[in-house]
C-alpha cells in the first residue's frame, strides 16, 4: 500500500514518546501502533536486530532445498535488475511463511551479510515491528517508514513487504528495503515489489499445476510423450521414461541433449508421429515399433499441437499403450464386471 509521505522528525518523536513514556500518538498508523504494543509486551530489544533464533547450517540447507523453486525463480527474476538495486541501495529478501529468511539477493540487509541474515527468523517476536511483521499479520502489502521500525539500527531506511499467496494461502513474503542514499519514489519501489510478487505467484501457481498433472500422468497405465521435430522428447511420463530406457534411449545431462526417438526407433519415419508433424492426427491406431532391442505393438494416438507462422507443426503429443497391457486391462475389467454384476450379487 502507498502511504502519504510523513515527516521523519515527527515519526521519530512518536517512536520516542511511546518507547520512553508509553504514550501512543493518535497520528501513528493503527497497524504500526498495534505492532509497537506487541513488541513492547514481548520485550524485543530496541537497539540491535537479533539473529540468534536461526537454523543450523544443515537444517537451513534442507529448508532451502525445500523452497528451491521459489529461490531460483526470484534469483533469475532479480538478476537483470541487480545494477538498479546497487544504484538505489536496495536490499531484497525472500522469507518463508514462518518468517525465516530464505535468501538475501542484493546488498547487505541493514549492514548484515547474506550469511548473517539467511536462516534467521525475523518475525515480530525476534525483531519487533517491521514491514515484514505487519504484512504478515494483515496479509497485505505494507510500506513502513524507517522511524516506525522497532529496532533502531533498522530505522535508517524504509521498507516494503508483500505476501506471496498460492491458492489463497501465504507461502512467502518478499521484502525490499530502501536505504535512501539516492532518493527513490515510494511508488517506484512498491511497483517493483508488486511486479515481483505477481510474477512469483504466477510461476508457483503454474508449478503446482504442472506437478499435479505430472503426478496424474505418472499414475496412468499408458506412456505419454511430448515430441519435438526431429524426434526429440521434450517430456514423457514415468512409464514413457521406463520404456525408452529399456530400448536404449539416453539423455545426456552434461550436454543437455534430450531423449530422441530417432536414436532408438528404426522405423520412426513410418510411424504416426512422423505423420503428425505433417499435420495428420492419428487416433487409437495399431502401430508396430521396431527397435534394436525388441519389436512392440501398441495402440497409439498422435495429436499435432501448435503451429508456427508458416503453419508447420511445432510439436505433437503421443499417447501409447502396449497391446499386451491393453489385453490385461480388458481382462481385469471383465473380471470386475462379472464379480460385481447385479446377478452375482443377488445370487441368481
Where are these regions (language model features)?
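Short, low-complexity N-terminal regulatory "tails/caps" that precede and couple sensory modules
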Residues: 1-65, 161, 165-187, 317, ...
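Intrinsically disordered, low-complexity polar/acidic regions
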Residues: 39-75, 82-85, 96, 102-140, ...
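Short, charged amphipathic alpha-helical "coupling" segments at sensory-output junctions
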Residues: 65-76, 188, 192-219
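Sensory modules in modular signal-transduction proteins
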Residues: 74-93, 206-241
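PAS-family sensory domains
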Residues: 102-131, 223-280
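PAS-family sensory/regulatory modules and their coupling/dimerization elements
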Residues: 147-152, 156-166, 264-325
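Hydrophobic helical signal-relay modules used by sensory signaling proteins
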Residues: 153, 212-217, 329-332, 336
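Sensory coupling linkers of modular signal transduction proteins
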Residues: 172-208, 304-347
Amino acid at each position: 500500500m502507498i502511504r502519504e509521505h510523513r515527516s521523519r522528525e515527527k515519526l521519530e518523536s512518536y517512536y520516542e514518546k511511546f518507547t520512553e513514556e508509553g504514550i501512543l500518538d493518535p497520528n501513528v498508523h493503527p497497524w504500526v501502533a498495534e505492532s509497537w504494543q506487541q513488541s513492547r509486551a514481548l520485550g524485543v530489544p530496541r537497539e540491535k536486530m537479533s539473529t540468534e533464533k536461526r537454523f543450523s547450517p544443515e537444517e537451513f540447507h534442507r529448508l532451502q532445498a525445500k523452497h528451491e523453486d521459489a529461490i531460483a525463480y526470484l534469483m533469475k527474476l532479480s538478476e537483470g535488475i541487480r545494477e538498479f538495486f546497487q544504484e538505489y541501495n536496495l536490499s531484497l529478501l525472500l522469507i518463508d511463511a514462518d518468517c525465516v529468511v530464505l535468501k538475501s539477493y542484493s546488498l547487505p540487509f541493514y549492514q548484515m551479510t547474506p550469511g548473517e541474515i539467511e536462516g534467521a527468523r525475523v518475525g515480530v517476536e525476534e525483531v519487533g515491528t517491521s514491514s515484514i511483521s505487519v504484512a504478515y499479520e494483515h496479509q497485505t502489502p505494507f510500506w513502513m517508514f524507517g522511524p516506525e521500525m522497532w529496532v533502531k539500527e533498522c530505522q535508517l531506511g524504509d521498507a516494503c513487504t508483500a505476501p506471496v499467496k498460492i491458492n489463497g494461502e501465504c507461502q512467502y513474503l518478499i521484502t525490499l528495503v530502501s536505504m535512501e542514499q539516492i532518493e527513490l519514489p515510494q511508488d517506484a519501489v512498491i511497483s517493483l515489489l508488486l511486479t515481483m510478487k505477481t510474477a512469483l505467484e504466477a510461476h508457483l501457481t503454474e508449478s503446482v499445476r504442472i506437478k499435479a498433472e505430472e503426478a496424474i500422468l505418472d499414475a496412468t497405465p499408458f506412456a505419454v510423450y511430448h515430441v519435438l521435430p526431429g524426434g526429440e522428447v521434450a517430456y514423457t511420463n514415468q512409464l514413457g521414461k521406463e520404456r525408452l530406457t529399456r530400448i536404449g534411449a539416453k539423455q545426456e545431462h552434461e550436454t543437455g541433449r534430450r531423449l530422441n526417438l530417432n536414436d532408438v526407433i528404426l522405423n520412426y519415419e513410418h510411424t504416426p508421429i512422423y505423420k503428425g508433424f505433417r499435420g495428420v492426427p492419428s487416433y487409437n491406431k495399431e502401430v508396430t515399433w521396431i527397435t534394436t532391442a525388441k519389436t512392440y505393438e501398441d495402440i497409439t494416438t498422435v495429436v499435432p499441437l501448435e503451429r508456427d507462422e508458416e503453419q508447420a507443426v511445432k510439436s505433437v503429443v503421443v499417447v501409447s499403450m502396449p497391446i499386451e497391457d491393453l489385453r490385461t486391462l480388458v481382462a481385469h475389467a471383465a473380471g470386475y464386471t462379472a464379480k460385481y454384476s447385479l446377478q452375482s450379487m443377488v445370487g441368481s
